[in-house]
């Protein structure tokens, strides 16, 4: 979101924006896969019982969503994540930052919006337990990821940039 705002303001190129997206995405994917496998599957947290059942149920629900609803869900999700970041940036102290981040994140989770990086944990966790496939994961990741980009880059950074640029 910060890099897209910089791209709108021509402080960085759109090529740099895309490069940043690629690096950040793969770093988050590797971290999420590591946590899902080692702390979920290997340690056994998602290997049996209620945690296994829940992670599979959640993942199956996410991968069952068609392309357009997943895309729109991704937009809504990252719109709330972007709002959380802006509220955090504007807060004067740690308590304000916590409150500013807590409510938008709580709302997107309660609504059931999809975030590509959160899905990079929960869907592979279900894959490691036999609940869904890697193909299901990729088919979910593409629309959610694209929606997250639109939600954060256009609905947060773009709206902020253009309202400030033309509002003053």
Question: Where in the sequence are the language-model features?
Answer:
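Alpha-helical transmembrane segments and their helix-helix packing motifs
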Residues: 1-168
């Amino acid at each position: 979101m910060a890099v897209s705002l910089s791209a709108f303001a021509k402080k960085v190129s759109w090529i740099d924006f895309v490069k940043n997206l690629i690096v950040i995405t793969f770093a988050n994917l590797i971290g999420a896969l590591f946590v899902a496998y080692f702390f979920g599957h290997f340690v056994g947290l998602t290997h049996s019982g209620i945690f296994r059942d829940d992670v599979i149920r959640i993942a199956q629900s996410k991968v069952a969503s068609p392309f357009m609803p997943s895309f729109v869900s991704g937009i809504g999700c990252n719109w709330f994540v972007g709002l959380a970041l802006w509220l955090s940036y504007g807060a004067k102290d740690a308590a304000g930052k916590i409150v500013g981040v807590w409510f938008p994140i709580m709302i997107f989770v309660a609504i059931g919006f999809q975030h590509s990086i959160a899905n990079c944990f929960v869907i592979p966790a279900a894959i490691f337990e036999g609940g869904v496939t890697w193909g299901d994961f990729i088919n979910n990741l593409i629309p959610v990821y694209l929606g997250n980009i639109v939600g954060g880059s256009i609905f947060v950074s773009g709206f902020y940039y253009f309202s400030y640029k033309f509002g003053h």
